Design a protein with these regions (language model features):
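Conserved class I S-adenosyl-L-methionine
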Residues: 64-72
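Conserved SAM/SAH-binding beta-strand->alpha-helix loop
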Residues: 93-95
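Conserved beta-strand signature within the Rossmann-like core of class I S-adenosyl-L-methionine
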Residues: 153-164
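Core SAM-dependent methyltransferase catalytic element
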Residues: 196-212
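A short acidic, Gly/Pro-enriched loop at the edge of an enzyme's catalytic core
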Residues: 121-130
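A short, conserved alpha-helix within the catalytic core of class I
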Residues: 137-149
């Protein structure tokens, strides 16, 4: 990964000591402030349970190193840790990642986290067995996923698609076009793909594998 100047914070959470690596300089401090404010509550903003698509398909994923992009409060990454994966979570919000560690402690697992500005981040090639990214849209980063996977590694991506605009005030730039995930990850072998629309939400999900 890109070498950012970092320093370490040691925090104690009800008996658990963990290391959270924090970048010294963030290019988008306004984003950090906005998400830190959102996560500054005891309640988990998006709940503690993982997304169903991940639970339903976890048996397909190769065991090993997971990179959880935009981890937030950790519901998906922590779930994978309970399933025996080694999890590194990245997010711009230190407060969100602190809650992720609390959730990991609650589930008797450990995770590693790093505070980064994903809009100025480069993934290390051939490093991860699984790359997980849910409800975070950054297409230039998506394009790095294939090279960052080990041969045989898989991506798991789920986020809102254009039909979601029917149900919520939501910026068009954060919504996928129809079948866009299939186009973005056309170099990978599609294992699972779905478009979901229940009349309240609409999103697309994909699991795809890098060739051996």
């Amino acid at each position: 990964m890109k070498n950012f100047p970092t320093h370490k914070y040691i925090a104690v959470l009800t008996g658990l000591v963990f290391l959270c690596s924090v970048t010294a300089v963030l290019a988008h401090p306004e984003d950090k402030g906005r998400w830190d404010k959102k996560y500054s509550t005891e309640v988990y903003l998006f709940g503690e349970k993982p997304i169903p698509f991940l639970v339903d398909n976890v048996h397909l994923l190769p065991k090993g190193k997971v990179l959880d992009i935009a981890m937030g409060e950790g519901r998906n990454g922590v779930y994978l840790a309970t399933q025996g994966f080694e999890v590194l979570g990245l997010d711009i919000s230190e407060k969100g990642l602190t809650k992720a560690h609390k959730l990991a402690e609650k589930n008797n697992v450990t995770i590693e986290t790093k505070v980064v500005d994903l809009e100025n981040f480069t993934l290390e090639p051939n490093t991860y067995d699984v790359i997980l990214c849910t409800y975070y849209m950054q297409k230039d980063l998506f394009k790095q996923f294939e090279s960052a996977l080990k041969p045989g590694g898989m991506i798991v991506v789920e986020t809102y698609n254009i039909d979601y605009l029917k149900y919520a005030r939501f910026s068009r730039k954060w919504a996928l076009d129809t079948n866009e995930l299939l186009d973005i990850f056309k170099g990978l072998r599609v294992i699972r793909y779905q478009d979901y629309d229940d009349g309240k939400e609409a999103y697309s999900s994909i699991i795809a594998q890098k060739p051996e």
